[in-house]
């Protein structure tokens, strides 16, 4: 069964992450300028950097969406027109907006940019989605709280020209589509103006009211004790349902995460989307790839009802570590590498890259920049060479299981 292929939208917290997402198969990337983005600590693009980022993406056939999704105060609104004009002039394809005033100003000062409505607007029904379309929105990012049946209903009862976007992978906020005041209250950092401190991820202790100052740590057992820590969403096994529900764009969360995360998760979803759209069984090797990045235990979120939200632990699973990044490779497989973490001759490592299925090898003797034998590269970012069984593309990764890193 052939299906319409949705856009794959990947995070790009900086230029390295953007290039990785592009190389590994993103149809579009989303990023932020230095103002009015919801993840001010996730990496941003300056006014000088943004045109270069847009040009790079467009040269590779990839669209650029920019977040303008904070809830600005009156004292901040005067800076919006100039910011929007810069985005418009840079060639940005779409703006992700949450505030109605910012949405209106975007129509005036960034007329070349599509207007997409952020998940911060908590769009949970067809009437709200249609209302935004009637106001001029090209796309709405649906609330994470929706079930698959609710998405189908929204698709059925809205204009077919309105595009529906939903998150398919990554962290989930325990608040209603990000409308949380914990950060404001506990740290003074406004979660709805791009400065969330993520207090829902903290580990808490208990204090009994008649024993002030005595703190009892919250221990974890087989039933779980962490509070407010949701699992990460992973819908890679259910992309057929999302496509059949009428979703036009699948979004990967993670602008604050690593370039390796952006690459591996994008690559995994790229291959599975292509398989499902062509009616082929999904190759399990790509499903396994999402287990090779740092993540919390996975769930299907609310797509199939509340049970997908049950959780036992807030701890990250970090089973794999990057050793090096391939910066170049000859047709014979002689790879030039940039070191990220120590490894040595004789270790078993994996190689994975753009359109490259992961394969294992035993590390041979390496060579430093002066052509001298190298048993264990140790200096971060150092350049060295290593022979591989076959040629691989630039931006491929050498990685190993974490238990090897103690050698």
Feature roles, as predicted:
Residues 14-17, 35-126:
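Active-site beta->alpha loop and helix N-cap motifs at the rims of alpha/beta catalytic domains
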Residues 1-23, 28-31, 35, 60-70, ...:
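Surface-exposed amphipathic alpha-helical tracts and adjacent flexible/coil segments at the periphery
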């Amino acid at each position: 069964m052939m299906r319409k292929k949705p856009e794959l939208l990947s995070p790009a917290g900086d230029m390295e992450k953007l290039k990785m997402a592009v190389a590994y198969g993103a149809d579009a990337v989303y990023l932020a300028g230095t103002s009015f983005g919801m993840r001010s600590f996730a990496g941003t693009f300056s006014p000088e950097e943004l045109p270069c980022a847009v040009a790079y993406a467009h040269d590779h056939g990839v669209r650029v969406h920019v977040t303008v999704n904070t809830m600005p105060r009156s004292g901040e609104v005067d800076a919006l027109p100039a910011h929007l004009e810069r985005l418009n002039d840079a060639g940005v394809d779409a703006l992700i907006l949450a505030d109605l005033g910012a949405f209106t100003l975007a129509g005036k000062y960034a007329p070349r940019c599509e207007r997409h409505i952020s998940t911060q607007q908590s769009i949970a029904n067809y009437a709200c989605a249609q209302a935004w379309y009637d106001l001029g929105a090209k796309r709405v990012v649906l609330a994470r709280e929706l079930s698959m049946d609710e998405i189908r209903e929204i698709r059925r009862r809205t204009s077919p020209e309105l595009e529906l976007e939903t998150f398919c992978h990554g962290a989930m906020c325990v608040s209603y589509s990000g409308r949380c005041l914990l950060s404001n209250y506990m740290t003074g950092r406004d979660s709805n103006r791009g400065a969330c401190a993520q207090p829902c991820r903290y580990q808490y202790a208990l204090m009994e009211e008649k024993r002030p100052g005595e703190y009892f740590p919250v221990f974890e057992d087989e039933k779980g004790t962490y509070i407010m820590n949701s699992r990460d969403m992973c819908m890679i096994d259910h992309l057929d349902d999302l496509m059949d529900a009428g979703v036009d764009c699948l979004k990967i969360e993670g602008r604050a995460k690593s370039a390796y995360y952006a690459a591996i998760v994008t690559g995994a979803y790229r291959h599975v989307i292509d398989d499902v759209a062509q009616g082929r069984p999904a190759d399990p090797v790509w499903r396994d790839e999402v287990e090779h990045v740092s993540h919390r235990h996975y769930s299907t979120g609310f797509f199939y009802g509340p049970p997908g939200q049950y959780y036992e632990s807030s701890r990250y699973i970090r089973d794999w570590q990057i050793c090096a990044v391939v910066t170049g490779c000859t047709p014979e497989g002689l790879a030039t590498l940039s070191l990220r973490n120590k490894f040595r001759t004789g270790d078993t490592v994996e190689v994975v890259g753009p359109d490259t299925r992961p394969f294992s090898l035993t590390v041979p003797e390496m060579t430093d920049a002066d052509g001298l034998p190298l048993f264990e590269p140790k200096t971060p970012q150092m350049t060295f060479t290593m022979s591989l069984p076959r040629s691989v593309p630039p931006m491929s990764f050498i990685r190993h299981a974490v238990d090897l890193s103690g050698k």
